[in-house]
Amino acid sequence: VQWCTCILTLTSPEKKQYHVTAAFPSACGKTNLAMMLPKLPGWKLQTVGDDIAWLKPGEDGRLYAINPENGFFGVAPGTSNDSNPNELKSCKKGTIFPNVVLTPDGDIWWEDMGIDAPAEGIDWKGNPCYRCIDDRKRMGPKPGMTKAEIKESKYVAAHKNSRFTAPAVNCPVLDKAGFNGKFNGKATGVPIDAILFGGRRPSTIPLVNQAKDWAHGVFMGSAAGSEVTAAVISDQIGQVRRDPMAMLPFFGYNVCDYFQHWLEMERTSADATKLPKIYFVNWFRKGDDGRFMWPGFGDNSRVLKWICDRIEGKVKAQDTPIGYLPFAKDISLENNTGKDTVNPKFLKEIVKVDKAGWLKEIEGVEANYAEYEKKPSKDSKEELAHAPRIPRALKAKLAEIQAALAAAK
């Protein structure tokens, strides 16, 4: 399987290694996660890849992954020493920066970089731009503009989807063996312990949700949706767009066949009990005030620890209609310090099931499935016979979850 996902190596304080893949739509944090500096003491994260994985079943039943790329392709705006120091260090040399600000001395700058803007520069359109007079970390299209004026104009000096393309060897936390496709000295790729799907969802979707079985995990991936960001060329910014397995722009063949291929992995595995556990994560829940309820970035290591604890059978979970959710007490709050911290009150909210929201979510998935199954324009027997069909196992999971939600108190 070729798949748009990052690959990371996570090492616990007990020196136990886990390999995790995470498939998110563009601008939802794949690169940030792949190079994260864990907030939890004693945990170490290394990067295998930030964008693509090739997956292959092993003779032992495990799923192995390699990174076929030789570098990183990250979103520039928002990348800073606070959000992801390892990502910024990866850009120190040999890096291409399209559509960012060019400074008079030949350097680069972008919004939320965490450093002062230059007094003047050339913006992503090739036009002059100037430092804001009351916020040294903002730039406007005219000299002497205030922060309020720039905000009202919706001007950005660096394009919201401006990027950096850096060689992988620059990464200070590169897992060199994993990057070279080796595990225990053999060129097998790294064995995957957990698969994460995710998206940018301001409501309904909990912080982390574990699939109850392989088919349920494939359903999670098939149902994935995300708030549209500037990384997508669209006039629907802010609306939820279905993006199954974070592969919508990249499917090389019919999406229904792709789902079936994932389902077949369980049947064809040499030992299906060794397949990775599947989870759905959401770092982007918002409160009624529109602010994020989870700090993200290095604090996402708290969720990864819970996932590892589940793999090891160390913690129990809430058995809900939508999957296994964590008890808030099992999300570690060790070293919960700094500028952005986990709010325990918010944490309790984002590990609950929003019944009404989920019933609407299931309706949305059902409607999206129907789109994939649209009949051909001509009703010939041959075309009808080859019309795409959502696998029965996924429809059964949808019906099962819908019924369980309806019956829940």
Model-identified regions with their sequence ranges:
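Catalytic or ion-translocation cores adjacent to nucleophile or general acid/base/metal-coordination motifs
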Residues: 19-28, 32-107
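Short, glycine-/Ser/Thr-/acidic-enriched flexible segments
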Residues: 12-15, 26-29, 38-39, 52-54, ...
